[in-house]
Amino acid sequence: MSWFEALILGIVQGLTEYLPVSSSGHLAIGSALFGIEGEENLAFTIVVHVATVFSTLVVLWKEIDWIFRGLFKFQMNAETKYVINILISMIPIGIVGVFFKDTVEQIFGSGLLVVGCMLLLTAALLAFSYYAKPRQKESISMKDAFIIGLAQACAVMPGLSRSGSTIATGLLLGNNKAKLAQFSFLMVIPPILGEALLDVMKMVKGEDVAGDIPALSLAVGFMAAFVSGCVACKWMINIVKKGKLIYFAIYCAIAGLVTIACTLLK
C-alpha cells in the first residue's frame, strides 16, 4: 500500500465512520479498487478505526469530561447511569467479538456483493427512521441501550453502517436526536479499543498483524482518518439534529445498486 492510497482510504474512513454510509463498506470498495486484500487490508482497517476513536475523543471531549467528573463522585447520578448504558450497549458486540471473530473476518473477505446488499439495508433503515413518527424521550433507557447495542453488533457486516444502524434504531425507539448521536459515537470507543488491544497482544506474541504495509502508509492513513473524522463527527451531529438522514438513505441505495451491478457484471 502506497502512502497516497493510505491517504485516500484514511479520508474515506474518517468521513464514513460518522456519516451513515458504512465505513467498512466504503473501505472494502476502496481496497478492491486499489487491489488491497487479506491481512494488509485488515491491519489498515484497525489503524484507521483507532484514529477515528481519537477524533471522537477530541470532538466530544466536553461530554467525556462531564462523564468522568460525575463517575468519580461514586454516586448513582446521571453520569454513572450513562456509563452503565454504554456498558450495556457493549454486550452484543462483545459476544460477537469473542465467539464469532473468525466468522466476521471471513465475511469481510466475502466480496462486494455482500457490501452492496448491506448498503441497501442501510438505506432502508435510514428511510424508516426518517418517516417514523417523532417522539422525544428524556434519556436513553437501559432497554434502549441494549437494543441499540444489538444494532451495533449487526453492523459488523461490511456495508451495514454502524452509525446509521445505531442512530436509526435509536430514533425508531423515540430518543432525542442530539443525545442519540453523541451516545452512538461514544458507545463504539470501547469495542474499537478492545479490538486494538487484541491485535497488540498478537504482535507481542510475534504474529504478523501489519502485513507488508510500510510505517509511512500507516501513519498517513491514521492522520487522514483522524482529521477527516473530526470534521465528519461535528457535521454528523448537526445533520442528525436537523433530521436530514433521508439524503444518506438515497446515497446508500444508489451506492448499493451500483456495487451490486458492477459485481454481477464483472
Curated annotation (Swiss-Prot):
It is found in: Cell inner membrane. This is Undecaprenyl-diphosphatase. One of its GO terms (biological process) is cell wall organization. Bacitracin is thought to be involved in the inhibition of peptidoglycan synthesis by sequestering undecaprenyl diphosphate, thereby reducing the pool of lipid carrier available. GO terms for molecular function: undecaprenyl-diphosphatase activity. It comes from Parabacteroides distasonis (strain ATCC 8503 / DSM 20701 / CIP 104284 / JCM 5825 / NCTC 11152). Keywords: Antibiotic resistance, Cell inner membrane, Cell membrane, Cell shape, Cell wall biogenesis/degradation, Hydrolase, Membrane, Peptidoglycan synthesis, Transmembrane, Transmembrane helix. It holds the Pfam family BacA. One of its GO terms (cellular component) is plasma membrane. Belongs to the UppP family. It comes from the Bacteria.
